[in-house]
């Protein structure tokens, strides 16, 4: 099994290369360095975002995971910007999705710092950011993934939001109700 197989040359960059069986945009060392950082930051964002979403809100673990998620999504956007700039014609849409994910995360992060617990802006911002990040991943990688390769391309664009939107809405509604109960002194 070859770990690296080059594709065609275009300008100074080798295009459509395969590394460990997965297609990458280039084998140029700078591209690969940014891609490596991008992948590690993306994995960190996926894990820490899931942790923050699943643990008790306001707990030390939620806060720590959320901060790591925000740092990771910031790095994902920064590296996506560089990677898209290197292959703008092919990857401009990934920059746009990355900008949306980073903007939503920033809105969610700032909203939580400026508003009281139970305010839904934080939940919606962070949840939308996570869904956008997964959309970018599946749009770019879905056609090369087992089982996902059988889905129509529109599914890569719509599934993360179709799954995420009801989860985000439920979490926001629950947070609103919990805040209302705590303000009135009712726990039931």
Name the predicted role of every residue range.
Residues 2-188:
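Alpha-helical membrane insertion/targeting regions
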């Amino acid at each position: 099994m070859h770990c690296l197989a080059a594709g065609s040359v275009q300008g100074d960059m080798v295009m459509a290369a395969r590394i460990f069986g997965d297609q990458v945009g280039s084998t140029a060392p700078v591209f690969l360095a940014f891609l490596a950082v991008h992948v590690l930051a993306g994995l960190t964002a996926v894990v820490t975002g899931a942790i923050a979403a699943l643990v008790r809100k306001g707990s030390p673990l939620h806060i720590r995971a959320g901060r790591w998620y925000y740092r990771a999504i910031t790095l994902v956007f920064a590296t996506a910007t560089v990677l898209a700039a290197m292959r703008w014609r092919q990857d401009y849409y990934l920059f746009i999705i990355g900008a949306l994910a980073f903007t939503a995360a920033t809105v969610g992060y700032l909203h939580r710092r400026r508003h009281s617990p139970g305010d839904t802006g934080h939940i919606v911002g962070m949840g939308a950011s996570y869904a956008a990040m997964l959309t970018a991943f599946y749009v770019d990688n879905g056609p090369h993934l087992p089982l996902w390769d059988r889905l129509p391309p529109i599914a890569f664009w719509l599934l993360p939001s179709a799954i995420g939107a009801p989860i985000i809405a439920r979490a926001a509604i629950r947070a609103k109700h919990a805040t209302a109960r705590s303000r009135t002194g009712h726990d039931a």
